[in-house]
Curated annotation (Swiss-Prot):
Name of this chain's protein: Arpin
One of the protein's GO biological processes: directional locomotion
Organism (species): Dictyostelium discoideum (Social amoeba)
Complex formation: Associates with the Arp2/3 complex.
Domain of life: Eukaryota
């Protein structure tokens, strides 16, 4: 199955891929080949985007902004898990660490649609798909992966996938299937073995749990 678009505007990375980008997780619904036929000359000084894509449709689960430092991607920003003392025995109520830059489906749609209020796709990219995508079909998004880079990827409907976008756009920087054997972390696509939200929570919670245990042991020693 394939589809195509005749596009008469500027189709460059500089035009559509500003911003830090997003990490998006969801359930793969379908994928097909989509071709963009450019009808206008493109700026010579800019980077023209590819014109053949694997169009990946997912049902949105969650998303977070990508985080960078000095041009290197680092894990998303987190609040620290905290322990609040209660009573004279210094018992603790715990406040779990949370992702600072987590976004919902509506926020993602606005960010990647280039101002198109009727769809999560920019105008004239693939208008036939609009009725089947957020916000018209809640939580359904289409992302475009360069055929030359991603056609070898083997996915099927129902797979849980994680997509990193190039800037705040629908264009795919990386995509991985999330299973026990092949799971990507935020910054380096190395094996971790869990979804990104729960994975990073576990790491922060473990650190805070160790700190809390040490504090409780010190408090107990004071009562001996």
């Amino acid at each position: 199955m394939s589809s195509s678009t005749n596009y008469s505007g500027t189709f460059t990375k500089e035009r559509f891929c500003g911003g830090d980008g997003f990490i998006v997780e969801g359930i793969l619904q379908k994928h097909n080949i989509h071709t963009v036929f450019l009808q206008a000359k493109q700026p010579l000084q800019d980077t023209v985007l590819p014109t053949r894509y694997v169009a990946i449709t997912i049902e949105f689960d969650n998303a977070v902004k990508r985080n960078w430092k000095d041009g290197v991607e680092i894990p998303p920003k987190m609040t620290r898990a905290t322990a609040i003392t209660k009573g004279y025995l210094n018992k603790f109520d715990r406040v779990q660490a949370t992702l600072v830059d987590k976004i919902n489906a509506d926020q993602l749609s606005v960010a990647i649609s280039d101002g198109n209020k009727n769809s999560s796709l920019p105008s004239n990219f693939h208008d036939d798909a609009i009725k089947n995508l957020h916000p018209n079909k809640k939580n359904y998004f289409e992302f475009w992966a360069d055929v030359d880079k991603f056609s070898h990827k083997i996915f099927k409907s129902g797979d849980e996938v994680r997509i990193k976008t190039i800037g705040d756009s629908i264009f795919v920087d990386s995509v991985v299937k999330m299973d026990s054997n092949n799971i990507a972390n935020f910054s380096g696509d190395s094996n971790l073995g869990d979804s990104f939200a729960s994975n990073i929570m576990k790491r922060y919670d473990q650190i805070e749990s160790n700190n809390q245990q040490q504090q409780e042991e010190e408090d107990d020693d004071e009562w001996k």
